[in-house]
Amino acid sequence: DEVIHYMNSRAKEPKPITGAAWVDGKVYLRLAGAKSAVEATAEKWTGEVMEQGGQFWQQLQHMQHEFFAGDEPLWRFSVGSTAENPDLDGPWLIDWAGSQRWYRGEADIAKLETMAQRAGGQVSLFRGGDRTDEVMHHQPRALKEIQQRLKKSFDPDGIFNPGRLYSWL
């Protein structure tokens, strides 16, 4: 939670920060913009400059970082950036200054949904794991109805990815 606070406090500063992530116990901040602003910020903030920084951020964006490899279930939490991290043992990767969090490990989706809701968000089983039931965060009836009406208006014949996200959509 200290890391989440740190990333969010940096993101609030009037600096050219365009990315904030926590991977393998390290915080990564991406700076981009006017050269003078980037240099001034890099000089003021402590840390190291990554030689392959562009490659690192691209790997995160396209889920090609080694964290995303492997057979263990991969869960994606989309939560409030300042919310406490759910109390789960196992590897985590935190991106978007805390708004997107990835967890690797076996878990019960109902338990994870409760944790995600407490953090102001949702969770989905992104890859692997038991896919015999819903893998996306369960939706309340009102949201289901809205999504079904939207789907019907954009795809009246139901030919585009039926049941891909939800069995009822």
Language-model features: locations:
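C-terminal substrate-binding/cap subdomain adjacent to the FAD-binding core in PCMH-type
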Residues: 1-71
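Conserved glycine-rich FAD pyrophosphate-binding loop
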Residues: 24, 47-169
